[in-house]
Design a protein with these regions (language model features):
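Catalytic cores of nucleic-acid editing and processing enzymes
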Residues: 1-234
């Protein structure tokens, strides 16, 4: 009697994606995010994934935060922290942000000590997130308006601050070698925040990393579109 083999489980995705997949259609320019012209992708950032190195950066920041006695006194603290690394036209960017409308962000320069991945290169960004569907800008620092159907459009999420922060650096835009981003939840011991406690990543090595929320999934595709405005038809 032949031995029955157990069905093989599908391989889990190595990296979480933020803002959809490259197989989708861009809501800003309405081109396919994997569309090519003259053999080259129209979108320098067709999708945003995380990486093992970025998850290690978040682990270190989390450790630093939990050693901050002043912060830990607030046992109700809860926020999302995010990190982004990008190489655009030969220039590298290493950004850190935390969610929330705080004038002073949760993550400060002192919390960036000891990061093993590009030590000393990281900086925090805390741009003002637009309150309405208008007045936004892309990573290329070009103006963009979001669809009015997007709910919670003004949510000051870490991922959004990272992309807006990159745009405000006005990077020279010739080629994108990579742009990666990862998020993680910080929840204080007494925080009554079940919405954040439910975020658990499904990545092969990142069971603790956070998914983007629905509002970010809708907003990120607009912000990562780097197709020049003069090349958008209609």
């Amino acid at each position: 009697v032949p031995v029955k083999k157990r069905p093989r489980k599908p391989e889990p995705e190595t990296n979480l994606r933020h803002g959809g997949k490259m197989s989708g259609t861009c809501p800003r320019c309405h081109y396919g995010r994997n569309k090519k012209a003259r053999g080259k992708l129209l979108h320098g950032i067709p999708e945003v994934t995380d990486s093992e190195q970025l998850r290690e950066v978040l682990v270190r920041i989390d450790r630093n935060l939990r050693q901050d006695e002043a912060l830990m006194q607030d046992e109700t603290a809860s926020f999302i922290m995010g990190v982004l690394e990008a190489k655009i036209s030969g220039n590298e960017y290493f950004l850190v942000a935390s969610s929330g409308r705080n004038a002073n962000p949760w993550i400060q320069k002192k919390h960036l000590d000891g990061i093993p991945h590009h030590p000393g290169a990281w900086e925090t960004v805390n741009p003002q997130v637009p309150e309405r569907h208008t007045g936004w800008w892309t990573v290329r620092n070009e103006n963009v308006d979001l669809d009015t159907s997007i709910r919670s459009v003004s949510n000051p999420c870490a991922a959004i601050k990272l992309l807006l922060g990159l745009g405000r650096k006005k990077p020279a835009w010739k080629s994108v070698e990579y742009l990666r981003m990862s998020e993680m939840v910080f929840v204080g011991r007494a925080a009554d925040d079940p919405s954040k406690r439910q975020w658990h990543g499904k990545g092969a090595t990142s069971s603790w990393t956070a998914h983007s929320c629905d509002a970010c999934e809708a907003r990120i595709p607009y912000l990562i579109c780097d197709v020049p405005a003069n090349e958008i038809v209609g």
